Swiss-Prot record:
Disulfide bonds: C250-C273
Family: Belongs to the peptidase M14 family.
Keyword match Protease: yes
Organism of origin: Trichophyton verrucosum (strain HKI 0517)
Localization in the cell: Secreted
Chain ranges of the Peptidase M14 domain: 125-421
Cofactor note: Binds 1 zinc ion per subunit.
Propeptide span(s): 17-119
Domain of life: Eukaryota
Pfam families, per the entry: Peptidase_M14 (PF00246), Propep_M14 (PF02244)
Single biological process term from Gene Ontology: proteolysis
Protein's name in the database: Metallocarboxypeptidase A-like protein TRV_02598
rRNA-binding among keywords: no
Length: 422
């Protein structure tokens, strides 16, 4: 167990916050998937070589995805062979994979169909931040009678945290709120596109979308961490946190460890250079302040019916809690049924398998997270954390060809989940 906790501490520690402005170069970097029956051997290699991990195991023989710089490949191969670890190459050259993924398609309003829907062309590529803003603005203009651009507040660098509020008949804001957050962790680009796909389907899927909009107001935020996302497109594709400068020269707070509920604990760290740095105080980050204030306003109005925090990767759909592996939400039975219906519907589309269960038991302990805050602090009726594609050989650098399949299966899961909501 101690070795698993060490791996959790080491998650991303090597590159977690020490890159202020220069572009990160991943040419020649390998991403290796390793496993073994003694996780202490893996944690020893990670610690000794100062390696970054993309994910760590819940148990022995589970996979650990490790980023290996070119200068350390030979030593990594030697040590992992001596330790008897199983290995697979995820990315032979991470730099090449990133270049391929960054073939951004220029934005044009022609990416909207004549009736205001989202042309599939938009979902065939990842996009720059400015183009996401244009897409949201043009999409809202095409549905001006039933939508508006909203902002929850400002990021550390002064960017608006922009979303789209959509509704059906009746007055805006008169129905219980559904809030979706994407790109809380900056490098998780598939979440940006998938959340936008859901937004599009609320209008493009005429029957199902209209039925949902008659019951709920949707608040869709594809990029909840705009500074971090911009940094991934301009400087370091693997950046996770926001862009605040911390003491000691490191940058960034993990925005999903900074929510003001159960903030302290083993599911985050006080190390400002770590990728799971929880910040100097609960709710300190400007992005967290903005999100909590905005959602409190919804709770004080018609209430919050559902919240989903979309992440990648690992193909998980999780329920509260993250701060504890023994605590359960008051309506845990309902949440588990909804999560299972999501997973079943997703699998029926492209065969993609999702695992369900409480956050702490399913992926890792995570205190100061948004889902726990939603359920216990503002009494939101349902809240989930999702980890989208993949479990294969791509991880965070998912090819753009998988955007549409991810959107299709996720929308199917969302519809199924709502069918279980009383």
């Amino acid at each position: 167990m101690q070795s698993l906790l060490l791996l959790a501490t080491l998650l991303g520690s090597a590159l977690g916050g020490a890159i202020p402005s220069q572009s990160a170069n991943y040419n020649g970097y390998k991403v290796m998937r390793v496993s073994g029956d003694d996780t202490s051997k893996i944690s020893h290699i990670v610690s000794k070589l100062g390696l970054e991990t993309w994910k760590f195991p819940k148990a022995a023989n589970a996979n650990v995805d490790i980023v290996v710089p070119p200068k350390k490949v030979a030593e990594f191969e030697k040590m992992s062979h001596a330790a008897g670890l199983k290995k697979q190459v995820m990315h032979e050259n991470l730099g090449d994979s990133i270049k391929s993924e960054m073939s951004f398609r220029p934005y044009s309003c022609e990416l909207l169909t004549l009736d205001g829907g989202a042309n599939d062309t938009w979902f065939q590529s990842y996009h720059k931040y400015e183009d996401h803003l244009k897409f949201m603005q043009d999409f809202q203009s095409a549905h001006s009678q039933n939508s508006e651009i909203v902002t929850s507040g400002k990021s550390h660098e002064g960017r608006d945290i922009t979303g789209v509020h959509v509704w059906g008949s009746g007055e805006k804001g008169s129905k219980p709120a559904v809030v979706f957050h994407g790109t809380v962790h900056a490098r998780e680009w598939i979440t940006t596109m998938t959340v936008e796909y859901i937004l599009a389907q609320l209008f493009d899927d005429k029957e199902a979308g209209a039925a949902l909009l008659e019951k709920f107001d949707f608040y869709i935020f594809p990029i909840a961490n705009p500074d971090g996302f911009v940094f991934t497109t301009e400087s370091d594709r693997m950046w996770r946190k926001n862009r605040e400068q911390n003491e000691g020269g490191c940058y960034g707070t993990d925005l999903n460890r900074n929510w003001p509920y159960k903030w302290e604990g083993d599911g985050s760290t006080t190390d400002p250079c770590s990728e799971t740095y929880r910040g100097p105080s609960p709710g300190f980050a400007p992005e967290t302040k903005a999100s909590t204030s905005f959602i409190k306003g919804l709770a004080d109005g018609a209430g919050v019916k559902m919240f989903v925090d979309w992440h990648s990767y690992s193909q998980l759909f999780m329920t509260p809690y993250g701060y504890s592996c023994s605590a359960r939400a008051p309506n845990d039975d309902v949440l588990q049924e909804m999560a299972s219906s999501f997973a079943d519907a997703v699998k029926a589309v492209h065969g993609t398998s999702f695992t369900t269960g409480p956050i702490c038991n399913t992926i890792y302990q995570a205190n100061g997270n948004s889902v726990d805050w939603i359920v216990d602090e503002i009494k939101g009726e349902t809240a989930f954390a999702a980890e989208l594609r993949d479990t294969g050989m791509y991880g965070f650098v998912l090819p753009p060809e998988q955007i549409i399949p991810s959107g299709e299966e996720t929308w199917a899961g969302v519809k199924a989940m709502f069918s279980k909501l009383k």
